[in-house]
Amino acid sequence: MDAVFKALADASRRELLDRLRADNGLTLNELCARLAQAGADMTRQAVSKHLAILEEANLVVTVRRGREKLHYLNPVPIHEIAERWIGKFERSRLQALSDMKRALEKRNE
């Protein structure tokens, strides 16, 4: 899980994930073109380096199609973080809201 947090800590890598979320299954060249259209100033080598870190963290998976390598967003690690860290805190907040709703309903009776 540390690799996922490390990968998500960089704004450039988050931008790459956003691009893949919007248009999954891109080659390196297609991804670079999409980033350039969005105004991101990243070299092909930088994109390649960031993709390698995202692959290590299992946030991006690749599939070979002939000589091309397609990059896909893998949302599972992010979902696991949400379940482990965010979900735990959200449950208690939802319970507090539910308790407050019941208390207000009793008061209005």
Give the positions of each predicted feature.
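Short, intrinsically disordered or compositionally biased N-terminal tails of bacterial proteins
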Residues: 1-4, 109
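N-terminal helix-turn-helix DNA-binding core of bacterial DNA-binding proteins
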Residues: 4-7, 11-44, 68-80, 84
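Short, hydrophobic-biased segments on the C-terminal half of alpha helices
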Residues: 51-52
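Amphipathic alpha-helical dimerization/coiled-coil segments
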Residues: 18, 22, 79-109
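Beta-hairpin "wing" of winged helix-turn-helix
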Residues: 55-66, 72
